[in-house]
Amino acid sequence: ALFQRASCYARLVTYFGDVVYVTSVVDIEEAFTLGRTPKSEIVPKIYEDYDKAAEGLPEKYTGVSSLRATKGAALALKARFALYMGDWEIAADAAKKCMDLGLYKLHADYAELFLMTTKNSEESIFLLPRSIEYKVTLGNWTVMNEVSRNPGGWGAFAPSWDLLAAYECTD
């Protein structure tokens, strides 16, 4: 639950800044009285949730459960969120802890990284399963990924020009 809460609030804070922050169930009347919590108060709580999640999660799962959140996923997503927040030392520390687990490494051939045969490579830290056969597809991720990052922009489905320019164009 801590991993999920941290991940959801990290996304909300990244997109919107100050948001309503609750850690317990509220009834509808109370919900209408809640105001936004400053981003500066929420960010440390997100880091704390990722830390507690990392303490309680296993380093890895096997079989069907292999796509569940792990210690490495909590550390990696904490590092990613810290980068977005400009907290370089927190990001570096979380990334180092993830790397020190010794479970992940870069895939040897970048060209084959995104093939079906290499979909669960050692480079993958946290995966969202997708399978037409088992009817596990994008679902509502389409909506979430189309939330604008900035006015007039698209979410994760449309790369920025900077990302495009980071790749060598050979055609």
Regions found by a protein language model. Give the residues of each.
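Aromatic-anchored glycine-rich loop motif in surface-exposed flexible loops
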Residues: A1-L67, M85-D87
